[in-house]
């Protein structure tokens, strides 16, 4: 379940949005959970709205002026409307003064109050993007997520197949590590899965015989990535005896794996002695990039083969006719 607390929102956006607690002596926290928001008719964040309330209400100078001109009865009615909504936080933007009625309201209702000198539109725009990422549908998968040639590639396979060793080889060739063992995937768009690493495992790669390796320390800052959109799955499959010959040499259809209702291209690479898996992964990524541009090597070969066959057939027909 994806969730974010108001305290976390405050801490992770404090510097860029110049946030301050409106009531520093009585900081109150609340949780925003994606299943509650999905089952609600309220918008996530927006300017102060009493008719269609938001989970996070943002007050600018215009909103404060509106509240100041209300009489006591009308103001109480409006605040009661807020109290009945699923209000998670109030943010007073534009460096506007916090009305005393709002201070009293948040203390009575135990609602977090934040103030900022940043423009309200800037706050809404940035927090919409932040909350969309934090509250996106999420799932964890076992594998290694890498940035290979600018593309997010997740290497999967059963335990002991050599995922970490392959990842280490790719990192040594200049590619980047995103996550090892546990990959957190968030659906941040209709067709986009973003992968990242849990904080506990960030920068680390476990390799049998070597233990835990700090990739950032060993290879430098450019060898790790904070997050990456996953576009390709490379599945490593062990081969037994001569079973490598059983794999299709010219696959006519592309494989896809559905994760969080998003289709991700999948390539299966047989693991056998003597195969350079790092080169194969790089080739798979380059080939997929070409396919995204409309260039399919397999289909091109098939068309060339069919054209050659058609030419030979026509030539054979002409020879038979002349005889």
From Swiss-Prot:
The molecular function GO annotations come to: ATP binding; magnesium ion binding; phosphorelay sensor kinase activity; protein serine/threonine kinase activity; protein serine/threonine/tyrosine kinase activity
The residues that the entry says bind Mg(2+) are 164, 206
Catalyzed reactions per annotation: [HPr protein]-L-serine + ATP = [HPr protein]-O-phospho-L-serine + ADP + H(+); [HPr protein]-O-phospho-L-serine + phosphate + H(+) = [HPr protein]-L-serine + diphosphate
Would the keyword Phosphoprotein turn up in this protein's UniProt record? no
The segments labelled Important for the catalytic mechanism of both phosphorylation and dephosphorylation in the record are: 205-214
Q: What is its EC number?
A: 2.7.11.-, 2.7.4.-
Top enzyme category: transferase
Residue numbers spanned by region Important for the catalytic mechanism of dephosphorylation? 270-275
Q: Which residues of this protein are catalytic? A: 142, 163, 181, 249
Cofactor field: Mg(2+)
Which key words are in the record?
ATP-binding, Kinase, Magnesium, Metal-binding, Multifunctional enzyme, Nucleotide-binding, Serine/threonine-protein kinase, Transferase
CDD domains with a match to the protein in the record? HprK_C
Q: Which SUPFAM superfamilies match?
A: HprK N-terminal domain-like, PEP carboxykinase-like
Write down the InterPro entries for this protein, in alphabetical order: HPr(Ser)_kin/Pase (IPR003755), Hpr_kin/Pase_C (IPR011104), Hpr_kin/Pase_Hpr_N (IPR011126), P-loop_NTPase (IPR027417), Ser_kin/Pase_Hpr-like_N_sf (IPR028979), Sigma_54_int_dom_ATP-bd_1 (IPR025662)
Where do the annotations place ATP binding?
157-164
**Other known facts:** Both phosphorylation and phosphorolysis are carried out by the same active site and suggest a common mechanism for both reactions.
PANTHER family in alphabetical order: HPR KINASE_PHOSPHORYLASE, PROTEIN YJDM-RELATED
> Which family, according to the similarity comment?
Belongs to the HPrK/P family.
**How does this polypeptide assemble, per the annotation?**
Homohexamer.
Copy the domain comment. The Walker A ATP-binding motif also binds Pi and PPi.
Instruction: Report what the protein is called.
Output: HPr kinase/phosphorylase
């Amino acid at each position: 379940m994806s969730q974010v607390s108001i305290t976390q929102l405050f801490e992770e956006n404090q510097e860029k949005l110049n946030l301050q607690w409106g009531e520093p002596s009585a900081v109150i926290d609340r949780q925003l959970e994606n299943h509650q928001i999905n089952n609600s008719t309220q918008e996530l964040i927006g300017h102060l709205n009493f008719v269609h309330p938001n989970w996070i209400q943002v007050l600018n100078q215009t909103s404060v002026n509106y509240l100041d001109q209300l009489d006591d009865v009308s103001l109480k009615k409006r605040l009661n409307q807020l109290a009945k909504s699923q209000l998670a936080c109030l943010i007073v933007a534009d460096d506007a003064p916090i009305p005393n009625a709002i201070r009293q309201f948040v203390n009575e209702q135990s609602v977090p109050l934040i103030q900022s000198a940043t423009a309200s539109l800037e706050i809404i725009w940035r927090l919409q993007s932040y909350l969309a990422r934090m509250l996106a549908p999420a799932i964890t998968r076992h594998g290694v997520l890498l940035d290979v040639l600018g593309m997010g590639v997740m290497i999967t396979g059963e335990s002991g197949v050599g995922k970490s060793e392959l990842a280490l080889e790719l990192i040594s060739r200049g590619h980047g590590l995103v996550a090892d063992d546990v990959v957190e995937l968030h659906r941040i768009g209709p067709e986009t899965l973003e992968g990242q690493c849990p904080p506990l495992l960030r920068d680390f790669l476990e390799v049998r015989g070597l233990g835990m390796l700090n990739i950032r320390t060993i290879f430098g800052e450019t060898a790790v990535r904070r997050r990456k959109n996953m576009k390709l799955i490379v599945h490593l499959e062990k081969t037994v005896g001569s079973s490598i010959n059983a794999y299709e040499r010219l696959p006519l259809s592309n494989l896809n794996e559905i994760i969080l209702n998003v289709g991700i291209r999948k390539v299966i690479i047989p693991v056998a002695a003597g195969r350079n898996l790092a080169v194969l992964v790089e080739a798979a990524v380059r080939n997929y990039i070409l396919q995204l541009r409309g260039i399919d090597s397999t289909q091109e070969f098939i068309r060339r083969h069919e054209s050659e066959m058609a030419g030979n057939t026509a030539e054979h027909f002409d020879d038979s006719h002349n005889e």
